[in-house]
């Protein structure tokens, strides 16, 4: 495993924990990470797509718990998330588009359980919505925690534990996205720290993304496995190491290759 340069001065610890989302932002642009996670200056406040994603995630948990009237419950979840949006964002929503999104969610949810059975065969539900808040112990004298949120954990008769992360999208992902290192590191890190939390052998854990596709005409729920061996785990932990070291060191370089779609572009925070 990678070894971190020791930083024992607690004053340097600007973050007591780090999540995959924060790591992904840092990898995109360290300066953007500083603005959001150090300065607490978050410009993006959500939109129709994020509201839909949160509502679908909540409804998936209800499906797995055997709830009835799931379409009505999803509609309630979706309405709640829409109402929680910034007022300006909410008032700019197009009602026809909102109705379309709601219908698409209602079409996806009845397919969840059948898709899991087709993909895994026999399985037992272990956990839903599980929090991770585990110490990063790979590096001596480096007291930090990794924070995560696992959507679903299943067990199969072969003794395997399966971690699943729901991803809402339009038509799906290209193969390039499915194989992208920073994307798959989410599940790699979840596997690593889940194994630590429950003191189980990582080799008995498999990880999967489940794509929930709004606009696809078929295969609206697509599951695929993400492999995470020792090499990939080490690579993910090395990136985590690099991020935390540079955050503590105050190295907030701007990645100008990531400026085009950044919400801070040409603002007073990043002129």
Feature map (PLM): residue ranges:
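RecB-family 4Fe-4S metal-dependent nuclease core
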Residues: 1-271
């Amino acid at each position: 495993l990678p070894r971190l340069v020791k930083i024992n001065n607690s004053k340097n610890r600007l973050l007591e924990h780090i999540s995959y989302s924060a790591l992904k932002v840092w990898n995109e642009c360290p300066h953007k990470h500083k603005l959001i996670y150090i300065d607490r200056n978050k410009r993006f406040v959500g939109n129709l797509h994020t509201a839909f994603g949160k509502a679908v995630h909540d409804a998936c948990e209800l499906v797995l718990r055997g709830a009835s009237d799931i379409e009505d419950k999803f509609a309630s979840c979706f309405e709640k998330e829409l109402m929680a949006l910034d007022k300006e964002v909410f008032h700019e929503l197009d009602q026809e588009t909102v109705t379309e999104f709601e219908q698409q969610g209602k079409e996806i949810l009845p397919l969840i359980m059948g898709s899991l059975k087709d993909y895994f065969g026999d399985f037992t539900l272990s956990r839903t919505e599980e929090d991770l808040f585990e110490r990063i112990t790979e590096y001596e004298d480096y007291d930090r925690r990794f924070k995560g949120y696992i959507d679903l954990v299943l067990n199969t008769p072969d003794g395997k534990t399966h971690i699943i992360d729901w991803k809402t999208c339009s038509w799906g992902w290209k193969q390039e996205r499915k194989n992208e290192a920073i994307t798959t590191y989410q599940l790699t890190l979840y596997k690593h720290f889940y194994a630590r939390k429950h003191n189980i052998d990582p080799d008995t854990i498999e990880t999967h993304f489940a794509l929930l596709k709004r606009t696809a005409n078929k295969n609206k729920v697509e599951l695929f496995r993400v492999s995470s061996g020792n090499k990939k785990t080490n690579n993910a932990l090395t990136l985590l190491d690099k991020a935390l070291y540079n955050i503590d060191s105050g190295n907030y370089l701007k990645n100008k290759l990531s400026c085009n779609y950044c919400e801070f572009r040409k603002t007073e925070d990043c002129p």
